[in-house]
UniProtKB/Swiss-Prot annotation:
Native organism taxonomy: Bacteria, Pseudomonadati, Pseudomonadota, Gammaproteobacteria, Pseudomonadales
Stated family: Belongs to the CRISPR-associated Csy3 family.
Disruption phenotype: Mutants lose phage DMS3 infection-dependent inhibition of biofilm formation while there is normal biofilm formation in the absence of phage infection. Decreased production of crRNA in the presence or absence of phage. Disruption of the entire Y.pestis-subtype CRISPR region disrupts crRNA production but does not alter phage resistance (possibly OLNs PA14_33350 to PA14_33310, and the flanking CRISPR loci), indicating this CRISPR is not involved in phage resistance.
Short name of one Pfam family: Cas_Csy3
Keywords: Antiviral defense
The organism's place on the tree of life at top rank: Bacteria
Function in brief: CRISPR (clustered regularly interspaced short palindromic repeat) is an adaptive immune system that provides protection against mobile genetic elements (viruses, transposable elements and conjugative plasmids). CRISPR clusters contain sequences complementary to antecedent mobile elements and target invading nucleic acids. CRISPR clusters are transcribed and processed into CRISPR RNA (crRNA). Cas3 and Cascade participate in CRISPR interference, the third stage of CRISPR immunity (Potential). Involved in crRNA production or stability.
Subunit structure of this chain's protein: Part of the Csy ribonucleoprotein complex with a probable stoichiometry of Csy1(1),Csy2(1),Csy3(6),Cas6/Csy4(1)-crRNA(1). A Csy3(6),Cas6/Csy4(1)-crRNA(1) subcomplex is also formed.
Misc. comment: In this bacteria, Y.pestis-subtype CRISPRs do not confer resistance to phage DMS3 or MP22, but instead are required for DMS3 infection-dependent inhibition of biofilm formation and possibly motility.
Biological process annotations from GO: defense response to virus
Protein name (database record): CRISPR-associated protein Csy3
Amino acid sequence: MSKPILSTASVLAFERKLDPSDALMSAGAWAQRDASQEWPAVTVREKSVRGTISNRLKTKDRDPAKLDASIQSPNLQTVDVANLPSDADTLKVRFTLRVLGGAGTPSACNDAAYRDKLLQTVATYVNDQGFAELARRYAHNLANARFLWRNRVGAEAVEVRINHIRQGEVARAWRFDALAIGLRDFKADAELDALAELIASGLSGSGHVLLEVVAFARIGDGQEVFPSQELILDKGDKKGQKSKTLYSVRDAAAIHSQKIGNALRTIDTWYPDEDGLGPIAVEPYGSVTSQGKAYRQPKQKLDFYTLLDNWVLRDEAPAVEQQHYVIANLIRGGVFGEAEEK
């Protein structure tokens, strides 16, 4: 009897296994970091400004008289801003991170044969490679405070404190000088080993892992800080509308959990990096929205779907580096079922 041909499930979904909370912002003095529980929250406030015409002009608007008239017409804007108080030089950003087991186990799959083969493939990876390399890179991105994004740029000093929380108590603690840990590579660092082992144990399901992550960035009294910006889908009448809305939780400026997660999974150095870009976030097509470019095009056969199908359906295991990339996508989570042809 011939063996049935395996095909991708039309319904295939995975839950994320790195589950961060929103990150809340507070402010205080660098010398008082040990008493930061008492620091006040950074608040978001509105500011109205008069801007100047600086956008690229259409050909019909380049007449000097029209330009002068445009300049005389005020460009009024209302925006949200967030700043440290005038007597506080340090930003504190705090979030928690759950590391969940069951990586590679789909939360939804409507094809039992495909599910069995997928689990077999993931089990082979875990037995051969384990989660050590991925966990080391996730630990690296926690320790270097990549999750601060723009708030990290230009900071005089950045310290990251990570606590392993067990039954509400601190079971183990780490401190890192974030600026001493690079953003462009993942060189082996002995001080990260214990944290990486803990993350790997969480991914393998051998223990409950909840981390409290606190970063302190010394940026200067009264300096502007950068919470997440909200996407306003229904802007209605654009005239008079606020042009920038910042995210806050209970009046505290905050960074979206999705943005924290994006920073933590910025570990993909296995794509064709012809531009010297460095690590990018793990995405099925290597998408970098800030550049409008996908670095893992299907024609290169290095995108997630091609690698996964070859590995699961055809028993063509990719190179070890690309295996890490595929499993990292499963840890990321998402809906990966077979697309319907129209």
